Amino acid sequence: MLNKMTLHPQQIMIGPRFNRALFDPLLVVLLALQLLVVAGLVRAQTCPSVCSCSNQFSKVICVRKNLREVPDGISTNTRLLNLHENQIQIIKVNSFKHLRHLEILQLSRNHIRTIEIGAFNGLANLNTLELFDNRLTTIPNGAFVYLSKLKELWLRNNPIESIPSYAFNRIPSLRRLDLGELKRLSYISEGAFEGLSNLRYLNLAMCNLREIPNLTPLIKLDELDLSGNHLSAIRPGSFQGLMHLQKLWMIQSQIQVIERNAFDNLQSLVEINLAHNNLTLLPHDLFTPLHHLERIHLHHNPWNCNCDILWLSWWIKDMAPSNTACCARCNTPPNLKGRYIGELDQNYFTCYAPVIVEPPADLNVTEGMAAELKCRASTSLTSVSWITPNGTVMTHGAYKVRIAVLSDGTLNFTNVTVQDTGMYTCMVSNSVGNTTASATLNVTAATTTPFSYFSTVTVETMEPSQDEARTTDNNVGPTPVVDWETTNVTTSLTPQSTRSTEKTFTIPVTDINSGIPGIDEVMKTTKIIIGCFVAITLMAAVMLVIFYKMRKQHHRQNHHAPTRTVEIINVDDEITGDTPMESHLPMPAIEHEHLNHYNSYKSPFNHTTTVNTINSIHSSVHEPLLIRMNSKDNVQETQI
């Protein structure tokens, strides 16, 4: 029994046999993976030695550490990285590639001159990028690629000299853009802000601007700061497209004049700050189109308090009746200096209604043409409106498809219709009252009758007598009186004398009323005729070329085959023993590999030899025939 129960050592291991050669590499791979995981966890939970970290390494502060480059060892969980006030000069490519959770990157107040393309790769969640107070001279547009969630960009106080077109089109998600204190800025392209359709805040303060740049692409802009510039005048159209703008700051911008209708595009404006400028007067009803305006700052301006400022006093009283001392004080005249504008009334002044120096004139036009009715007052501080024939009052900025009031008060028609016919009244207003002037617009329907290309002009001339001719040699000739009609046009020359000889000339001329369409029709007909002539000429040239080639080919065929009478002779019938072979033709060359070239027959030889030879040739060359020419010219051999 014991012998049966004794187990051999080889039988102790049950199952598959252990293979150490396979186990060792697998163990190495597992250990490597564990090390990588541990290293990743360690890196995710580490903090650079020169920085301070908080909130489970999500906030890394490296301020004023004299860093010359981005430090290593920043946690991948970092959401805010502050590198403020260091010595960094270059942001190299992939400097933040592993910080995929980073939302705020603060690089302000360094010495950054260059930002390489791809420097911000991997920052797909970046929300705010601060680059103010550095040494950038250009907008690093190429570095903004892939910042699809960037909302705020701060470039304040950099020596940037120009802003080219599409400078920010790589970051259409941008909401706030700070370009303030670009003191070396000398040029802003017309398309500089293209692509920023989602921008809500723009700072262009202290940028040495002498005029307002094109802001039309910023259709959602809410706040605009233009303070500290050199904007001597604000003109109509400066804020075109900014229908959603709510806050406008132009503090200390050296503004001297704000022209009529300058703010008409700002329909949503709530607050405007014009403090610390050089304003003395404002155009009548400047703020009237701003129905949502609630706060206005006009202090620290040298206001000249006269009749033209009364409307502003009344407007302030209506806007803030409980606080008329809120806004501005008079600087001149001396008797009103220091008095608040909101406290003035008409008793302080002797005022008059406005004067229209260029009233509109009656106008006759044809349907479809453009037209203008001008109306100019003695001063640009008045407001101008128009009353249409149906009683509608039109002001600058009022939406009409074909009719608009321009900034100078002109009523402009881009395409008149017959329905536009009627009387239009220009109304010029100031604080005292209104002055009106009217004009009639007469629109004639376009004629649809067929036009004649030519009409007859009858010219009647009267020759003066010799005495009168001598007295009028040194004088200017009589002024012709021209009367044009639709069908018959007559030009009359009226002399100074009644004694004359009348001569009548009939001259065909182009009808004035139908001249333009007649010329068009003639040009069309001329083009058609020229086109047909060119086509016929080309076809004739092609036919001549074809005819020439066919004739040349036919001539060659006739040259190689001259017309002659030939007689085909059967060799078996004509060749006899008595006939010498001198007059026989030589045999043609037989182009077969097994035959040699046949030479001319030699004479004389017997008939038997000749017959045998010919029979042998018949069997080889399929019975050739000899051609005998009737003439004594050279003979050709032909194989048939």
From Swiss-Prot:
It is found in: Postsynaptic cell membrane. Coiled coil: none annotated. Residues 463-483 are annotated as: Disordered. InterPro entries: Ig-like_dom, Ig-like_dom_sf, Ig-like_fold, Ig_I-set, Ig_sub, Ig_sub2, Ig_V-set, Leu-rich_rpt. Residues 45-76 form the LRRNT domain. PROSITE patterns: IG_LIKE (PS50835), LRR (PS51450). Pfam families: I-set, LRR_1, LRR_8. Highly expressed in the cerebral cortex, including frontal, parietal and occipital lobes. Putamen, amygdala, hippocampus and medulla oblongata show moderate expression. Caudate nucleus and thalamus express small amounts, whereas other brain regions show very weak or no expression. LRR repeats lie at residues 77-98, 101-122, 125-146, 149-170, 173-195, 198-219, 220-241, 244-265, 268-289. The chain crosses the membrane at residues 528-548. Its main location: membrane. The LRR region is both necessary and sufficient for the interaction with NTNG1. This is Leucine-rich repeat-containing protein 4C. It comes from Homo sapiens.
